[in-house]
Amino acid sequence: MPSQSRSRDRYRGRDTEYTRRRYPDEHDYSHDDHDYDYDDDDDDNDDLEQDVTERRYRRDGYRRPRGESRARAYYERDAAAAAAHDEELLAEERERRRAGASGSPRKSGQHRERDRDRERDREAQSRRRTYEDDGRHRTRDGRRERRREGGGEGGRRERRRGESRRGEAARKHQSSDSTNSASHLLSADALARLGSQYEKEDRRERAHAKDAAKAERKRRKKRAVVGEQERGLRAEKPRDRSRARVASGAYMEEGRGPEMEFRRRGGGGPPMDARWPKGGGWGGSVDGGDAGRPFWKQKKWLIGIGVVILILVIVIPVAVVVSKKHNDKPNATTTQPDGTTPSNSNLDGLSPDSIPGYAKGTFLDPWTWYDTNDFNVTFTNETVGGLSLMGLNSTWDDSARPNDNVPPLNKPFPYGKQPIRGVNLGGWLSLEPFITPSFFQSYSALSGVIDEYTLTQKLGSTAGARLEKHYATFITEQDFADIRDAGLDHVRIQYSYWAVTTYDGDPYVAKTSWRYLLRAIEYCRKYGLRVKLDPHGIPGSQNGWNHSGRQGAIGWLNGTDGELNRKRSLEVHDQVSKFFAQDRYKNVVTIYGLVNEPLMLSLSVEDVLNWTVEATKLVQKNGITAYIALHDGFLNLSKWKSILKTRPDNMLLDTHQYTIFNTGQIVLNHTARVNLICNDWSAMIKEVNSTSGFGPTICGEWSQADTDCAQYLNNVGRGTRWEGTFSLTDSTQYCPTADSGPRCSCANANADPSAYSADYKKFLQTYAEAQMSAFETGQGWFYWTWRTESAAQWSYRTAWKGGFMPQKAYSPSFKCGDTVPDFGSLPEYY
């Protein structure tokens, strides 16, 4: 008889047929065509597989339904049935022997053939039972498998039985007894045929097993291969549990199965895919620490796929929007005015997950900021006065001073004894078309883009990115260092109400400029510069000019919403004053402005003054100890001798003086202009600054511009007085040579400063220094403005670097009282 291979697939087909035949009512025929993960091995680690399945069934703790009981139940039933069948065969054999004892040993061919068939059936049945009993329980019980292999007592009993049968056959062969002789002849013939048949079947089964294994490797279906399934029995799966993958065969034998190598969560080693090939029918994994428990379950796969799809549905549109947003922002290579690029290195090592969900994508989320340099990017939702502290450090140092002539920040500035020498940051946090014409040049007159309101309305969703780039790049830390180096000691910083809040219908970019305002103050602190806060845009517009945010009607204290906007403006000051009343600002924010240039020539003077007193009391009640600045409203300064004689303490009057918006002054020649400043303005400022006048007075705005030629200075699309294009109905030129000629032109005034003649530079510096001298008879001055894109005569920075401004503001070359220098051959028409 052929040796019994340990390959489980060798008799798999007959095992299935045997089960069908023996248990026709209990076998589930719908699962005969099983898909197997098979490797033809001769030395499976069946103990391991037994452990896997046994642990799994003990863990699950369930009962099997009829027809699908555990293998051990099959074994007990098989043994009983086999015993009954053997009894039938023995009884039949005894009857046959009794019948044959009285007959001739030579029987007819028909009888011999029938006996041979019976003998063949009996031998085949015995052989099937031997293999069936062996195969069914080899996986389920490792000890029984070892006995079958001959290593245990059971194996020795099997060998003794085999030897006993062979001995009995030999005795029959040697006996002359007719019964024995007949039996022997039949058994030998049957065994010879059976041997030949089995060898053929073995070859067919091996070929079949090889083909089946090859086909199965292609399918790679995720089916569990447990003991019963390997022999054609359907393995019961507990309800609501998915099958685990159990690998067997050569992979397991070589230690390459998942139980042998599986990277756990937090464990080391290569990824699962690198350890376990996806070929050969593999389609999953097993957790080696809990054999039989699935790592990937079918339901989890479906849920996972659904989650991935959902994430893609969310992420792709967001990525498109973010990509569009970043296209509107400069990339990492965009240079700032000083040639540097925006720095976001302080985000390194931090996670966007540190930002709460409610703050993601808002002005509180530093991952949405264009520039995080010198901001504290640690998240906080803390507020003071309802205004965010996000971006601020918790410590500060007030020991700096801008120069030796000025006390450090932690020492009081001697207002009234030492003049303010400062500069404005106009056109930065509150746009002004002539300072940054690039925002407006690309639009036609028909577009109606004339101010920040219409600009942000036109920009729509891209306004935030566009303006934040401007906030981050137009004024940088280097500017504050330069302001200090220029000998200046104060900075007047403009902001508008939308830095604090916005209202329904507002297109303005809300709150972003607030962060840059706070950073600017910290830069001022670093370089010892004191700050004057100045709200340029008030709800409703206080003057109807473009730098108030919206050009047109005045809606503050005036018109249908005048009272509403009055209330709103006080609410803004309530918040802002509470914020800047913090100790950290007491030494650096030393002047607190109420409103820039309220047009009291159009507004009720009484209404403006009443609001001014109420606002002053409000902010002082909230803790502001700084000087409170109010603008003169374009009233004649002499009138302020009798205005607000009884007022709150610590108030300053702010006046803005220009020679180019007055048609009687713009026509003066160069020398006459300097004389006007030193003779008239100086006396005017000195008078209003006295106790007989209003009292402490500063000049919050002035420039060295001697023409109104700067682009958009007189509003977007408006001409100039200098060239006679200001009015659509009047072409009169207002310039020194208007009557005598030649005709005045803006070409020279708007030329690049490098083209300025030495005489023109000399005039511009003398003109500037004369104004400094005049305004220092009061509390001091703030030049308008520090930087422009193209209007050189309005940029202190350009003039300082271009050589037509004193290198140190506190050390001018000219003072009122000095002889006005000769400007040589400088033409009067520019």
Curated annotation (Swiss-Prot):
Residues bearing attached sugar chains per UniProt: 331, 376, 381, 393, 546, 558, 610, 636, 669, 689
UniProt cross-references to Pfam families, sorted A to Z: Cellulase
Membrane topology: Single-pass type II membrane protein
Localisation per UniProt entry: Cell membrane
GO cellular component, one term: plasma membrane
Compositional bias annotation for Basic and acidic residues: 1-34, 52-98, 110-175, 198-215, 228-243, 253-264
Biased composition (Low complexity): 181-194
Active-site residues, as the UniProt record annotates them: 597 (proton donor), 701 (nucleophile)
Transmembrane intervals: 302-322
Chain spans, region Disordered: 1-279, 327-351
Acidic residues bias: start-end ranges: 35-51
Keyword Cell membrane: yes
Disulfide bonds: none
One GO biological process term: glucan catabolic process
Annotated keywords: Carbohydrate metabolism, Cell membrane, Cell wall biogenesis/degradation, Glycoprotein, Glycosidase, Hydrolase, Membrane, Polysaccharide degradation, Signal-anchor, Transmembrane, Transmembrane helix
Enzyme Commission number: 3.2.1.58
Reactions that this protein is recorded to catalyse: Successive hydrolysis of beta-D-glucose units from the non-reducing ends of (1->3)-beta-D-glucans, releasing alpha-glucose
Record flagged with keyword 4Fe-4S: no
PANTHER family: GLUCAN 1,3-BETA-GLUCOSIDASE 2 (PTHR31297:SF34), GLUCAN ENDO-1,6-BETA-GLUCOSIDASE B (PTHR31297)
Family in the record: Belongs to the glycosyl hydrolase 5 (cellulase A) family.
Function: Glucosidase involved in the degradation of cellulosic biomass. Active on lichenan.
Protein name as it appears in the record: Probable glucan 1,3-beta-glucosidase D
